[in-house]
Amino acid sequence: MASLRIVFMGTPDFSVPSLQALHDQGFDIAAVYSQPDKQRGRGKKVSFSPVKEKALELGIPVLQPDTLRDEQVVAELAAFQPDVIIVIAYGKILPKAVLDIPKYGCLNVHGSLLPKYRGAAPIQYAVKDGEAVSGVTIMLLDEGMDTGAILKKAEIKLDPKETTGSLFDKLSVLGAQALTDVLAHIEEYERNACPQDESQATYTAKIDKETAQIDWTQDAIVIERLIRTLDPHPGAYTWLDGKRLKVWSADVVDGAGAEPGTIIAVTKKNFTVQTGSGALCVREVQPESRKRMQTAQFLQGISLQPGDVLTRE
């Protein structure tokens, strides 16, 4: 059904492959809605969202209202007469007045296998919890938070060293593929829409800066997952000699019974830190005010010895 008239709502990189796929397959994209521009950096330079940049590149009109609860904004949206509204990480809640506009409703691409991992950080939580499988869900939006009927799920296996960044990229492409399939057969998918099992629902919350500080009393497996969860942003960190040190890659190894946070081994290529259970061999770090680097490079410029301690602030 390439003749479907679509309004697309999205903001970050995750949404871009879907917008590109809809354009490539000839869907009629009447308009793109994205979050208002932000000022970034010391110079307060205006920064466009990735979705806005892609829409402008494709020649699609872009609207950036502060709210969707204004009657004039809703009327302007309704004037596009969309058959369906696609919502992918837009960043705003759609009121009922908007949900009721399109013939086929509002479709969302969510970065988990719902009803598991509803909320703001499904991709991060899949990595943090050590999931072997993740995926995307195409659902019909309702007034709840990720509670709508499911149209399609698509699964993917996680690599043992999967990071939030790598899974984000994979799921953004998988989501685009699943979305275009649903839109091509939308009436069939909506006839077979499946309500979510509320008894299986779990929720995620945004991961804050406090979560990013490594607690060496935790198990090595838990810390290693946290490191991958916070890659590429904001990065898990610890403190060495009063300076912040981000840890980007580590392997779980046997511990030595030392106090958590104690460095128990140092080689030319890496160093090993005792945790609450087991230890972590640190492979990649980022010293304060410097770029990411292999631990071998970091060790060339510092005298690190067994018995030194990594701390919390």
Which residue stretches match the model-derived regions?
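Conserved beta-strand segments of alpha/beta enzyme cores
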Residues: 28, 59-61, 105
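Short beta->alpha connector loops
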Residues: 11-14, 66-69, 90-92, 253
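N-terminal glycine-/serine-/threonine-rich beta1-alpha1-beta2 phosphate-ribose binding loop
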Residues: 39-81
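N-terminal Rossmann-like dinucleotide-binding module
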Residues: 1-42
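An anion-binding loop in the catalytic cleft
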Residues: 217-313
